A protein has these predicted regions:
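Conserved, carboxylate-rich catalytic/transport cores that coordinate ions
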Residues: 1-149
Length: 149
């Protein structure tokens, strides 16, 4: 469907449809990594996959792209967990972070010894002064690494 909108491959040409059907939703999830919005997309995809497709209904109109919606939701939730993003607010899934917050009058947080946050960005980064610079840098680096792979 996505490849045919651009151009139908000629005889003896490789059809990139299989590659595109996986890479397009995955790269969408990398760009749109948010757990809440991904869950909404995932639930819409599940609904359209399970809904009866009577002629003239919305489910029949969305039927060609229902699996794309489902996969875009799955990958968006996955990347949202990696980015630790839930409606642009960090999630404290594993209790405290690996940083000790400073006492009054100090601007420097100190790392707890031998502490690694289990998955995703440490939520303390969302309270840092350079939050936007750091988080956008991490997202760009992840997108570049995954895009090259």
């Amino acid at each position: 469907m996505v490849v045919d909108q651009y151009e139908v491959p000629a005889y003896k040409e490789v059809n990139p449809g299989l590659f595109t059907s996986i890479s397009f939703p995955f790269l969408f999830g990398v760009m749109f990594g948010d757990v809440f919005a991904g869950t909404l997309l995932l639930s819409a995809g599940l609904y359209f996959c399970c809904a009866p497709q009577t002629p003239g209904s919305v489910a029949a109109a969305v039927a060609p792209g229902r699996h794309f919606l489902l996969m875009m939701g799955i990958f968006s939730v996955f990347c949202g967990i990696i980015y630790n993003d839930f409606t642009s607010v960090s999630m404290y899934l594993f209790g405290d972070s690996c940083w000790e917050m400073p006492a009054h009058g100090s601007n420097t947080a100190t790392a707890k010894p031998d502490c690694v946050y289990p998955i995703g960005l440490d939520p303390t980064w969302y309270m840092a002064q350079n939050e936007i610079l750091f988080v956008n840098s991490v997202k760009m680096k992840i997108a570049l690494i995954l895009g090259v792979l």
